[in-house]
């Protein structure tokens, strides 16, 4: 799956199997564990699930990755990640224990894993994801997705 984010960067690392819609109410920890499992079970890009999980949660300890506007971008770089990987979750219920600068609990979570060797590329993608989700219309279109297929269609519309 390839799609374009504003600014012309292709997110060549996102796979349809890594896009989910979650209807159950979940805590921040549950969502992150779910997404980590999703990436590890559906790709061969994570060589050590325990280390990747530890890095994701350690990053959260440094400060929230909730960027506001109902969006969170948990991310980590570690040696056991072979290439950049993205997973997207749309939640029916906001994550009530996920801190954000504007107190708007996340309903969209983009999990990003990257190898230590791709630091600048990783930062470029994180910056573009953040910029893209500042657009209210983009966020609304994602949040209005009724199911996984609609969510995929909306993600494919990024940058058009």
Each PLM stretch: what is its role?
Residues 1-160:
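Cytosolic covalent-transfer regions centered on His/Cys nucleophiles
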């Amino acid at each position: 799956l390839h799609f374009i984010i504003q600014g012309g960067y292709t997110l060549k690392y996102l796979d349809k199997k890594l896009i989910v819609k979650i209807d159950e109410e979940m805590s921040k920890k549950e969502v992150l564990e779910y997404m980590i499992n999703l990436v590890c079970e559906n790709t061969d890009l994570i060589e050590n699930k325990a280390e990747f999980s530890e890095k994701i949660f350690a990053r959260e300890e440094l400060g929230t990755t909730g960027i506001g506007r109902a969006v969170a971008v948990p991310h980590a770089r570690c040696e056991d990640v072979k290439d950049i990987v993205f997973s997207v979750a749309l939640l029916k219920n906001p994550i009530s224990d996920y801190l954000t600068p504007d107190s708007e609990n996340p309903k969209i979570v983009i999990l990003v894993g990257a190898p230590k060797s791709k630091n600048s590329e990783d930062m470029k993608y994180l910056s573009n994801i953040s910029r893209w989700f500042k657009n209210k219309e983009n966020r609304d279109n994602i949040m209005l997705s009724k199911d996984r297929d609609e969510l995929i269609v909306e993600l494919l519309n990024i940058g058009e």
